[in-house]
Amino acid sequence: MTFGNQCDETMSHAILDYALDAGVSFIDTADIYPANGVPELVGETENIIGRWMKGRRKDVVLATKFWAPTGKNPWQGGASRRNILDSVDDSLRRLQTEYIDLYQVHFPDYETPIDETLGALDDLVRQGKILYAGCSNYPA
């Protein structure tokens, strides 16, 4: 469910309430959601989750992802150090939290050396901005 496109904020909060009440504690999103090609909506799902999460942060394991272009500049996408550092701060702000439990590279970035990506993610763990780093949509 990409909140902010398929359903409005009120319905999104109701879905999240229902899930939490049913025992669902893992919330997974991405900085690009809702991914519908409307630049003004980029990050809106994180905004909605952040507003919902007030007073509930300790009750959820929060995961989000980065990689897709979120702006017009060439560094606003991919798994480069610059994009990772900018993206995590943007996600933390939208999610209204001090840390992300699981921060994932959304897709492989064949242009950026993996050491650069892993080094930036390791720095975020050391800074306390993320607890764990992961990847999504990578081939086996």
PLM regions and their residue ranges:
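N-terminal binding-site loop/beta-alpha segment at the start of enzyme catalytic domains
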Residues: 1-60, 98, 126
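Structural detector of well-ordered beta-strand residues that form the stable sheet scaffold
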Residues: 27, 63, 131-134
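Conserved catalytic core of Hanks-type protein kinase domains
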Residues: 19, 65, 94
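Tryptophan-centered motif/residue detector
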Residues: 3, 52, 67, 107-108
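Glycine/proline-rich, positively charged
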Residues: 69-140
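Active-site-proximal beta-strand elements of phosphoester/diester hydrolases
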Residues: 1, 64, 102
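A short, structured active-site edge motif that brings together acidic residues
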Residues: 59-70
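Active-site alpha/beta core segments
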Residues: 53, 65, 75
